[in-house]
Design a protein with these regions (language model features):
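Residue-register detector that marks a fixed positional context within folded domains
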Residues: 1-158
Length: 158
């Protein structure tokens, strides 16, 4: 499957440009105002473009760049975005912080861990794409870019 097939499969708008890059290559190909997202975020994490409100606001508030995130983070945030859309719950990124702690795994990136063993999100997305963690897409175009495009230390006020 090429980039056009990938865009069709994940319902990425035609005005969004994707450029495939293996691990390491994106550092030299990324331009200003472009963002790098691991392909696994779409495949296992349910990442969508344009980003959902919860996903976008969580990344901005925590100053986390999309390529620093493990698929789990996108999976949880995307699940809440979907719940809001389908059930009109009105949850915000503050609710995510209340229920989850953000942790860093050196090789995987930032992930969310539930603060409570009694309450967890049920996540039904696939986890069968071993070897894809080193594949990235550079995203540009008109996709409502509202997240960091330059890597910074997480936390604090953006």
């Amino acid at each position: 499957m090429g980039i056009e097939g990938f865009k069709a499969l994940y319902h990425i708008p035609w005005c969004v440009s994707l450029q495939y890059n293996p691990l390491g290559d994106w550092h030299t190909h990324k331009k200003e105002r472009e963002v790098v997202i691991p392909m696994i975020a779409f495949i296992e994490g349910g990442m969508r473009l344009p980003m959902g409100r919860i996903t976008r606001n969580y990344l901005i508030a925590n100053r986390i760049y999309p390529h620093q995130c493990a698929p789990n983070l996108f999976r949880v945030l995307g699940s809440v975005d979907t719940l809001n859309k389908q059930m009109g719950l009105g949850l915000t990124w503050h609710d995510i912080v209340w229920m989850n702690e953000c942790h860093l795994l050196t090789e995987s990136g930032y992930y969310l861990k539930s603060r409570s063993f009694e309450v967890r999100f049920i996540l039904c997305l696939s986890k069968s794409n071993k070897g894809m963690k080193d594949d990235f897409v550079i995203v540009s175009g008109e996709w409502d870019l509202h997240c960091l495009t330059q890597e910074e230390a997480p936390g604090g006020v953006p």
